[in-house]
Amino acid sequence: MNYDVIIVGGRCAGATTAALLAREGVRTLVLEAAPRHADMPLSTHFMQPPGMDVLDDIGVGEKVRGVTPPTRRARYRMEDQDVHGPYPEGRPAYCVRRATLDPLLQDAAEEAGADVRFRHRVVELLGDGERVEGVVVEGPHGRERIRARLVVGADGRASTVARLTGVEEYLVRHPQRAGYWFYFPTPGLWHDDPRYADFDGAIAWEGDGLRYLFQCDGDVLLMAAAPPKEEARAWGRDYRRRTLEYLGRSDLFAPLLAETAPLGQGRGYLGAPSFYRRAVGPGFALVGDAGHCKDFVTGHGMSDAFLGARRLTKAVLQDTPLAYERYWRERDATTVPYHFDAVHQGRTDLNDAFTRLIFESMKESEGLSRRHGLVLDRRRHPRNLLTAREMLGIVARGVLRGRLLPVAGMVKNAVAWRGYRRQERVYQDLLRDVGARAVPAARSDATPALSTPR
């Protein structure tokens, strides 16, 4: 049987895209290399409010809410400054383990009418040299050739579809931090101790260190360490003990660690580049980490995958070359600000005098904290947390109190932010160019018509 769309990869991006397409009557096949209900070794876990909106579209949102406690208010620590940042009213975030989430997404795809096959690994792409026309897949019963009008790579940062099509990468950035995390049975302290009473999750910058604490489904806590790569490289196979020691150096984490022990061996890696890849080509498209992968420190990757699935579905249903190009350019224009924000927040020297002064101001201003919630909800640009006038005023007040070091930090950040803005405008201009060409157009051989939705 041939399909309208073959999706390679059946997790966040792939299963969500399949559910959205199948609900519109598009004949959709999902090929997932792993067994059903296999865990995902590396994942940020965190779903920001816009990502939850997409899960509501496919009927998974309430299932996630039913098993996962919400993160309505987070604590952000910069040395001795604690800022409490609320999410917008009624729009919390959720930290759900992939062993829980992925089956919900895969079930949603199947219930919508998609054909989901597990233990099926794509080894080749079919085509005439000009466009992709299908895949060669290895499954439990051998090799099979399957054709489709569109092949979607939703198979992660090491995407087979991206590799076989040879798409170019751009905006490549190498992280300064590693990431290691464990799950812990939630100790009574988390619920009963007043030290943990006014927040649902925490991110702490102390020295050049970065630590995370969030509540997950199944009454477990996720605690994560993001040390500089140079430090983590020395941990080697002793990462379990070293991660726990690293977490325990913070007085926010130490009391919890004294009352609980990690489940399993934990996960982690020394960091991998963030990047963009060309999102479309003749007969194929990329979605999720296959097309764009950012630094994990800001926890936007899963939401990007869900939003990308919604955007790609729109392009598939419109089914014109311009629609696919718009999908690509919208992805870039809407995510590049958060890409650079992740690069910025992943710096090992972020904890400087300037940033600490900003934290002090956020602590004194509930309005600034609420603005941060709007950034996480993607209703405010990440670098519009403060206006230029507000930033100058904060630094000026610090200077009047004899604090001169923040001036150098402000200048350094201003130079970096100007560079980010300049590059953001490039991708905004490319999107505007697509909009200027948005006139009725006949279908092109670049992407043949899909079947009429049922």
Predicted regions, residues:
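C-terminal helical "tail/cap" subdomain of flavin- and related membrane-associated enzymes
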Residues: K314-R454
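Conserved FAD-binding catalytic core of PHBH/FMO-like flavoproteins
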Residues: G142-E144, A154-F253
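Conserved N-terminal helical subregion
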Residues: D53, P70, R75-L164, L171-R177, ...
